[in-house]
Amino acid sequence: KRYLIFLIFFVPLFYKSDSLEKFLISFQWKPFNVVETKDSIYGKITVLKNEDAVDFYENSSKVYSTVLSAKNEEITHLPLFLSYDCKNILLLGGGLHNIREILKYPVKKIVYVEQNPVLVELLKKHSDDRIMSLWENPIVKVISTDGRFFIKRTTDIYDCVILDVSPPLTGLANRYFTKE
């Protein structure tokens, strides 16, 4: 009965208000500091800050962090080391740390395809100076479109394609691992 009284009096205060949503989101992400949330057609993107790191989550799954991980080095260095004289690189997903690792090689062009334009917008907005320089690098081209769609439509030839997407556990992710 107390909860019903609470609902009757307090829910109308939050009706059509962002404050209830902000409260619920900050409660969901405790103890992290929620910097921003934004909806896209691919899901809700949440930007969290914890100490020196800024982390980006899409539908509650971490998709990018401003802290470099060993995963970024593994994903980029292995194919570039095994390939000979790669000048034109296509990077599907994975974020800016992969670009930073690729730039350690004498490449001429990096095309970074990120499906979610809202994620790209938030990455640019919440990047520090070190990361921001990657966005402004003249050999880096960022394209916001579906990676598989891009591969089917491009006429460019790439010396190396680096795929940094989710494992093929869902139909959406499996598209990158099939011929159909």
Model-flagged regions — what are they?
Residues 69-180:
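The AdoMet/dcAdoMet-binding core of the Class I SAM-like
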Residues 2-63, 69:
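Basic, ligand-binding patches in group-transfer machinery
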